[in-house]
Amino acid sequence: MNWCFIVFSSFATANRVKSLLLKNHGIKSTIMQTPGEIKLKSCSYCLKINLLHLDTAWDMVVRSGLSSKGVFSAEGFNKIR
């Protein structure tokens, strides 16, 4: 299964998105500390989601006006959004 990480600066924001994804779209995700392979200037939390749900999840983040540090592939940790 292909995974990706949507990175947020706070646990609260990640948790809000996780709840909205499950409630509004039935999409399950996992909150975790951002892997060290993703080089960011500060610590952060991310949602690990199936890549198949990325468009739905990203649209929800944008429409909600929430701030994200980006989306990274779980394979290679490349920034994809």
Indicate where each model-derived feature is located.
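Short connector loops at helix/strand junctions that flank enzyme active sites
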Residues: 1, 42-44, 66
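Short glycine-/aliphatic-rich beta-strand segments at the starts of folded cytosolic domains
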Residues: 1-7, 47
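Short amphipathic alpha-helix segments
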Residues: 10-28
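Short acidic, gly/pro-rich beta-turn/loop elements at beta-sheet edges
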Residues: 16, 41, 57-59
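Conserved, structured core segments of small domains
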Residues: 19-20, 32-37, 72-74, 79
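C-terminal structural segments of small proteins and small subunits
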Residues: 50-81
